[in-house]
Curated annotation (Swiss-Prot):
It comes from Methylobacillus flagellatus (strain ATCC 51484 / DSM 6875 / VKM B-1610 / KT). The keyword Cell cycle does not apply. InterPro entries: DarP, DarP_sf. The gene is darP. This is Dual-action ribosomal maturation protein DarP. GO terms for molecular function: ribosome binding; rRNA binding.
Length: 180
């Protein structure tokens, strides 16, 4: 018979409930699922033990649901023996940067749509981003409106988006680094 796992509490050493052990195993399996969804280059950056890396790569190849479920349980079992905190922290950093990137992308799309639809939006954009070349933006807005009215592909709209991205990513004027 296997000895029960125990946990130190303020009342001494108590056995860990089966429910808690199952919840911990499920959490490790969820991390394993996340690992299987990562591209290989990110997996290699995580510095995983070789057995775990092999198991994750094997899970990526498996197509059978039953076999994949067993492989995920195996990955969860391997993860019980390692410290998962650094892995979870790195995954959260990657997820945070991805979320920030999506939010920035949506803000740029909103600016582009407002500029195309609303005449007064350009002055707001210029006041927020003073390093904007207004004439270039006006030309792209005008062309995007024409293309939309004619039912043509949104070439100027894409160019406007690229220009807005370069403007918003550029440092504000007066904050340029000096090369000493």
């Amino acid at each position: 018979m296997k000895p029960d796992k125990t946990e130190n509490t303020e009342h001494g050493i108590e056995p860990v409930s089966k429910t808690k052990r199952k919840a911990e195993a499920d959490a490790l399996q969820a991390i394993g699922v996340t690992l299987t969804e990562l591209p290989r280059d990110k997996l290699n950056k995580l510095d995983l033990p070789e057995a775990l890396l092999d198991a994750v790569n094997e899970a990526k190849r498996i197509t059978s649901n039953g076999a994949l479920r067993r492989q995920m349980q195996y990955i969860g079992r391997l993860m019980r023996d390692i410290d998962t905190d650094p892995i979870v922290e790195q995954l959260q950093r990657w997820e945070g940067s991805h979320t920030e990137e999506n939010a920035r992308f949506h803000r740029l799309e909103q600016w582009r749509n407002r500029l195309i639809e609303d005449e007064s939006a350009l002055s707001e954009f210029i006041s927020e981003f003073p390093n904007t070349e207004a004439q270039q933006v006006r030309n792209l807005i005008r062309n995007a409106r024409r293309e939309h009215a004619a039912g043509k592909p949104p070439k100027s709209s894409r160019e406007l988006f690229k220009l807005l991205r370069s403007i918003t990513e550029a440092p504000p004027p007066g904050t340029e680094l000096s090369a000493d």
